């Protein structure tokens, strides 16, 4: 992934020139709880990508905590220079936070099975406090603020964009007496209000947040859950493909209109 990013950035700049605006989007984690566990996961889930892309090197600690499953001998001469291409903006996907703690399991040997956090077999994921979205993810607007501030503190040279943020709800389609259709989703509106406020606090504290994309415009196919989870601010009747704007759509429209100028 890191090499592909470097090759893509080189190719775009070679083809488009100075007009090119290059970026990368990462699913960054923000964890709460035990400091050692949070640091371990930050190395594996965040800095394994951010450091080579933005600093031109992998963290030394990353090598030590993954030595039981990987010797990193695949890194070839010139790879880091290729990965470390200048970008104009860093995209961040954010939905929720995790609560973690170090376990009493030994770090090594570690399983070589597929994992979202290789090198963290001695970290426990703990239950999070509610409320939760329909995905089971906790709602933590402060986590967005804290993540934006931390990324800016560590990598101050790059502008930031929130490329995904939103929630899945158990949306119900209502057919009104006059035949019109509506979807009332007050929880989603509250979610967006609170996350927008958290992002605004980060901006006020100096974070160069230049964009924000709500996930998502339409209900869509989720990789793991298919059509069972609805993130859109527009309801999709999958049988007819009809699109019905939800209450959150109207709220978001009015919010954007109020911000013009």
Regions found by a protein language model. Name each.
Residues 1-261:
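Active-site region of glycoside hydrolase catalytic domains
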């Amino acid at each position: 992934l890191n090499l592909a990013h470097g090759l893509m950035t080189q190719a775009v700049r070679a083809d488009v020139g100075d007009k090119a605006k290059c970026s990368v989007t990462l699913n960054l984690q923000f964890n709460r709880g035990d400091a050692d566990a949070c640091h371990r996961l930050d190395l594996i889930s965040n800095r394994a990508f951010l450091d080579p892309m933005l600093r031109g090197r992998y963290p030394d600690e990353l090598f030590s905590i993954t030595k039981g499953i990987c010797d990193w001998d695949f890194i070839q001469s010139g790879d880091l220079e290729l990965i470390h291409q200048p970008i104009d903006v860093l995209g961040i996907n954010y939905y929720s936070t995790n609560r973690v703690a170090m376990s009493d399991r030994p770090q090594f040997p570690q399983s070589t099975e597929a994992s979202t956090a290789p090198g963290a077999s001695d970290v426990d994921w703990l239950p999070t406090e509610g409320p939760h979205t329909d995905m089971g993810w906790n709602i933590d607007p402060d986590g967005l603020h804290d993540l934006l501030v931390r990324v800016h503190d560590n990598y101050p040279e790059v502008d930031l964009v929130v490329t995904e943020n939103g929630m899945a709800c158990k949306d119900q389609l209502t057919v009104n007496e006059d035949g019109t259709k509506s979807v009332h989703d007050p929880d989603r509106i509250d979610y967006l209000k609170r996350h927008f406020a958290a992002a605004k606090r980060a901006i006020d504290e100096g974070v160069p947040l230049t964009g924000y994309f709500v996930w998502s415009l339409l209900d869509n196919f989720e990789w793991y859950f298919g059509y069972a989870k609805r993130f859109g601010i527009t309801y999709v009747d999958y049988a007819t493909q009809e699109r019905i704007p939800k209450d959150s759509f109207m709220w978001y429209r009015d919010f954007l209109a109020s911000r013009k100028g």
